[in-house]
Amino acid sequence: MEYLAHISDDKTRKQTVLEHSQNVAMLAKQYADVFEAGSWGYCCGETHDIGKYSDEFQERLKGGKLVDHATASAKELIARGGMYSLAAYITAGHHAGLPDKGTDADDAGRGTLCGREKKKIPNYQAYKDEIKIPELERPKRMIGKNAFSMAFFLRMIYSCVVDADFLDTENFMQEGKTNRQPGIITEELWDKLTSYISSWLACKDEDTVNGHRTQILKSCIKMGAEKPGVYTLTVPTGGGKTVSSLAFALQHACVHKKRRIIYIIPYTSIIEQNAKVFREILGENIVLENHSNVKYEEGDELNPMQLAAENWDKPVVVTTNVQFFESLFSNKSSRCRKLHNIADSILIFDEAQMIP
């Protein structure tokens, strides 16, 4: 029997569970490799949909009743024990959101991981004919012994898996014809910036406003070549902080091969001003402005920036404190999709004193 994961809207095309699982596994591994946890992305991606290996789910694709297909993977991973029990959180929540653990007293009706483990679900054992649960490697980076570190690590893997799942499903349903235009920092962006600031750097004044602005800019460029760490920039109003901070970030990204720059700013008015400058320097398609005031033209298809707002896969992202921190601590797939793209990025907190 052929087990399907998706059927196109016009009913003419099919994607098997095996094909979808392998696609998600490879993409999730690619994302998790950035923070040296590729085996976790691969394992969770490969197993997340094994619950679709049931007759009931196959009937669901033909219009049948709803079927829980996410619990199956969690059951299999929990049965393996050890690190796999942690991976179970990710596959259990790839649609409904990361669950709480709960307690052994929870019954099957509870949405906790302990409750889900007791839930009766359709027989899915046919998965064993096509999918083998991959090996999990211990994370190479120290996670820490506290619960917060472990929870955040799992949230990052969750982000890799749900984004890969969304993207592969989207790619199948739209036959690869999406409007996505992902990108990372390149030397070309540095060239655009140096062209923009060439007149600033040519300034020979020392005691004028322009002269001080030039010195601040040069200092930022110099510091951009230093090793990764935590840096502060204090500049008076009119000192060119917006361009100077971008110069630091682009220099740092090019020297240390960082993937993107994320600006986190408290006020939308400041975001709009900064994003306008960044677009003027780098180009319209490079800068994602992500906050509640952004309006998009309505149409049959989402434009590239609307799509990028789902997972922050643009070279430069400008967003609010609220958007950033709510995403960091969310358990919902829609908010967590973007988290893996924070890894190996440069974070700039503007007006950092405004953080509560």
Each language-model region and where it sits:
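Accessory nucleic-acid engagement/destabilization modules that flank
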Residues: 1-196
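Conserved pre-motif I regulatory segment
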Residues: 17-20, 197-234
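Short basic/glycine-enriched coil/helix segment immediately N-terminal to the Walker B
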Residues: 225, 310-314, 333-345
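Conserved Walker A/P-loop ATP-binding site and its immediately adjacent core
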Residues: 244, 249-250, 257-281, 294
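Inter-Walker segment of RecA-like/P-loop motor cores
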Residues: 282-329
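SF2 helicase catalytic motif II
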Residues: 321-325, 335-356
